């Protein structure tokens, strides 16, 4: 594998992902973990991403929704990493019908429940929401920018814990730094709200999905074929 340009390919894929392709964020997050010592199967996975990008080179992010409003979505897998059983976080924020910022990453701590994994993911997403809210407020072009940004989550336990003023028995083992989300919610920067799992468009940033579900979420992130837009 010494002559395989694995790191170079990962860098090229990252350029595409950061600019316009949130749909490959999860695949990149997984394959980039093996840059130090990639195997043949890892290289095959990277080539699959490159082939997918070539096949879908006419896709672009489209902003043309009905309202100029920022909305966030957060989700996580549970102990999905095959090497250390850590979970994967993902979030995406949309504005005017298209994704404006997104992230897919492995969590740095092992969780023992889906609620804990999703709580950690929501905390990460909420911190990004704080920066995004300040940015759009300073721009002065988004109506109601002083209102909390809606951050949608499909886990009722996460929503309840995010609104708790103090830690309790169920969350005492969660690292304290993740409870920052409570301060963010109390301050009014972000409001954590419920969304059905099938409508959570952060799902593709955390796990592999069926083709139909993946394509639907991709469209809801604003990723369209250029032929459908022109």
Predicted regions and their residues:
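C-terminal reverse transcriptase regions that engage the nucleic-acid substrate
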Residues: 1-59, 196, 204
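Conserved pre-motif C helix in the palm subdomain of viral-like polymerases
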Residues: 3-25, 77-80, 88, 115-131
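RNase H-like nuclease fold core
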Residues: 13, 73-115
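Conserved catalytic core of Hanks-type protein kinase domains
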Residues: 16-19, 52, 94-96, 124, ...
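RNase H-like nuclease module associated with reverse transcription
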Residues: 34, 67-69, 87, 105-230
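Structured nucleic-acid-interacting core domains from mobile-element enzymes and related host factors
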Residues: 51-74, 144-145
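Conserved helix-loop functional segments at active or binding sites
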Residues: 55-59, 79, 99-101, 135-141
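Conserved active-site beta-strand-loop modules that form the wall/rim of enzyme catalytic pockets
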Residues: 58-60, 69-71, 90-92, 98-99, ...
């Amino acid at each position: 594998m010494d002559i395989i340009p694995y790191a170079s390919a990962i860098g090229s894929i990252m350029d595409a992902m950061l600019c316009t392709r949130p749909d490959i964020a999860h695949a990149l997050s997984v394959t980039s973990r093996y840059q130090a010592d990639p195997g043949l199967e890892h290289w095959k996975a990277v080539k699959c991403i490159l082939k997918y990008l070539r096949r879908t080179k006419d896709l672009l992010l489209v902003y043309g929704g009905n309202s100029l409003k920022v909305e966030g979505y957060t989700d996580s897998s549970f102990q999905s990493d095959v090497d250390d059983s850590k979970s994967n976080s993902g979030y995406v924020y949309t504005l005017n019908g298209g994704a404006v910022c997104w992230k897919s990453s492995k969590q740095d701590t092992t969780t023992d429940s889906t609620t804990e994994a999703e709580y950690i993911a929501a905390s990460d997403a909420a911190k990004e929401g704080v920066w995004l809210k300040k940015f759009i407020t300073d721009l002065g072009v988004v109506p109601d920018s002083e209102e909390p940004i809606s951050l949608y989550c499909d886990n009722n336990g996460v929503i309840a814990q995010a609104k708790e003023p103090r830690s309790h028995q169920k969350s005492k083992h969660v690292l304290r730094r993740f409870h920052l989300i409570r301060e963010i919610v109390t301050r009014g920067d972000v409001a954590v709200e419920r969304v059905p799992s099938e409508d959570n468009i952060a799902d593709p940033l955390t796990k592999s999905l069926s083709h139909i579900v993946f394509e639907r979420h991709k469209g809801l992130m604003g990723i369209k074929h250029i032929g459908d837009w022109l």
